[in-house]
Amino acid sequence: MAYTFTTLKTAIQDYTQNSETTFVSQLSRFILNAEERILKECQLDVFRKNVTGTASTGQQYLQKPGDFLAQNSLSVINSSNKEFLLYKQVTALQDYTPNPTTTGTPKYYADWDEVTFLLAPTPDSNYTMELHYFYRPTSITESADGTSWL
C-alpha cells in the first residue's frame, strides 16, 4: 500500500490509538527519524543514482552531486569501455602523486571534502566520468504531493 504523508500519520495514530496533542504534533519528527534510520541501515536500490560529468584537463578535483551521501563507484569512460577508479585515502593519493602537476588518466580517487573528490593522477585531458552513488531522497514530510519512496 502506498502512503501519503496524511495517510501515514493517520495510520500511525490508528495503530497506536493515540490522538494526544503532543504525540500528534511530533509525528513529523517520528517519521523523519524512521526515514533516517532506514536510510542508514538499508542500502535499498531506491537510494542509488548514477550521473556522468567531466573531469577537466589539469583539474585534480571533481565536484560531487548536491544530493551525494556516499560513493558506490567512479569510472572513466573511454569510448565504450569503463575503467573503474580505486577508492583510497587522500594521503595515499598524495603519496602516489606528490606533485599535482603530474598528469595522466585518473586511476584513484578520494573524498577531499564533503563536496569534492580528489583524482590521481591529475587528468591529462577531459574525461567523461560516471559516478554511482547513494543519495538522500526527499522525505515524505517535505514532498510537494505528500508521497515519497516509502
Language-model features and meaning:
Residues 1-150:
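Glycine-enriched, solvent-exposed interface loops adjoining structured elements
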